[in-house]
Amino acid sequence: MNTQTAPSPQFYLTAPAACPYLPNQMERKVFTHMVGERAPELNDLLTQGGFRRSQNIAYRPACETCRACISVRILTNEFAPTRSMRRVLAANGEIVSAEYPAEPSSEQYNLFRRYLDCRHQKGGMSDMSVLDYAMMVEDTHVHTKIIEYRLRVEGDGINDKARGPLIATALTDRMSDGLSMVYSFFDPALSERSLGTYMILDHIRRAKERGLPHVYLGYWVKGSRKMGYKTKFLPQEHLMARGWERYSGEHDSTKPATD
């Protein structure tokens, strides 16, 4: 009888580095590798515990004097779009979305590059090459999909694959209790369409159709303009010291705390 058990994941701590969200703060992260047959199960457990995935690595903040990064997930079964969100949906009625295996394309990378060059020129991803992008998409041992968003053009049938330009893309993990938006990007020339909001609304729809109660949005930092959009999608839960707590928009759940 084989009594061997699967090895437990090993966790590591990064060296301190400048925080990309808060001035005069240093960040550290705890991380582990997710490979092999247990990777999907481990991804579920870690994401539910506040980790995020990047390629085959799961990480979460482990800063010594700050707890400002708060994991956020939308409660899809209770979600109802606001008036402004309904306007976004109406304005993008001609968009067609389709789900594919996690495989990169030159069209995706060209859009990704335009997005970074316009929105994140000084970010940590600003110098990513086409090979880096391919690794970001393909290096996964979990249930990952690419969702492409295109404009329908004249001549497209209802059931046809859209032939219009690629205007947005999302890299998404399917988990047992929801969808996790790993990374998304869009055409910066179409900012009036609010494509970031549209993709989140589309993920809420997809999760509902699959009977999944959550859409995971990653981290939110109060006062960060980069992350302010995440708290518009209510109701949602924030991962606090006692577990996932419902967020109403009234309490200051991101006040930095010290140990």
Curated annotation (Swiss-Prot):
Its EC number is 2.3.2.29. Coiled coil: none annotated. GO terms for cellular component: cytoplasm. It is found in: Cytoplasm. It catalyses: N-terminal L-glutamyl-[protein] + L-leucyl-tRNA(Leu) = N-terminal L-leucyl-L-glutamyl-[protein] + tRNA(Leu) + H(+); N-terminal L-aspartyl-[protein] + L-leucyl-tRNA(Leu) = N-terminal L-leucyl-L-aspartyl-[protein] + tRNA(Leu) + H(+). One of its GO terms (biological process) is ubiquitin-dependent protein catabolic process via the N-end rule pathway. This is Aspartate/glutamate leucyltransferase. Belongs to the R-transferase family. Bpt subfamily. Its main location: cytoplasm. SUPFAM superfamilies: Acyl-CoA N-acyltransferases (Nat). The keyword Membrane does not apply. Functions in the N-end rule pathway of protein degradation where it conjugates Leu from its aminoacyl-tRNA to the N-termini of proteins containing an N-terminal aspartate or glutamate. Keywords: Acyltransferase, Cytoplasm, Transferase. InterPro entries: Acyl_CoA_acyltransferase, Asp_Glu_LeuTrfase, N-end_Aminoacyl_Trfase, N-end_Aminoacyl_Trfase_C, N-end_Aminoacyl_Trfase_N. One of its GO terms (molecular function) is leucyl-tRNA--protein transferase activity.
